[in-house]
Amino acid sequence: MTDFDKPRESCGIFGICDHPEAAPITYFGLYALQHRGQESAGIATIRGDTIIEHKGMGLVSDVFDMSHLNVLEGRSAVGHVRYSTTGSSVLTNAQPFLVRHRKKSYAVAHNGNIVNAHTLKDELEESGSIFQTTMDSEIFLHLFVKNLEYGFEQALVKSVSRLQGAFSFVMLTSLGEIIGIKDPYGFRPLCLGKLNGSYVLASETCAFDLVEAEFVRELDPGEIVIIGPAGIKSIKTSPATRRAFCTFEYI
């Protein structure tokens, strides 16, 4: 079995829902989060009823120019900058990670580590899953797709409940929804903001400052937020009995 990536202290994630300049705003959000990752950068957005993306190796300013942003024309977007370390530094492992399932698309950007990744991957491969990367992030999408038989919200809850570790996710659906997920310990940061009536999610509030978004709150430990054109819904899963923090988040 191919080993997963080595642990990363931090990556940067950003998402915005229902804004006419979603991709350019995500670009600037990632630019503000560049200190969290310099290995690769990517943005996913919607075209019609599917998700398209552009990603590459290097800094945000190296990966994107106006021609790329003009193609990424959807009203919702998620983005990712990846922490640089030795090993697995290949474009295949750049995020957001995109999957298509039964005429729908999902793209996920992930910060953190899933410590039971090997066990879950073995289980998923035994049941027929085929992995395209060495990212533990991909495990979440495989779990999510398998749990969709229980409905969209329960698929999120059931999938997150299987994960152990320190993590936060932003996910884009082909319906234009943005989902934010925070681990039960609240180990990895994820902030909620507003920009001219649109909701934004980011690893740090410095991304809000650059795009002139208003900070609303930090997501609670174990919280899932589902953001669509009609508004926002919060799902509180079971948080850990104590909150934990990552020392690297305070450097």
State where each predicted segment sits.
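Conserved short alpha-helical segments that host acidic/polar catalytic motifs at enzyme active sites
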Residues: 1-251
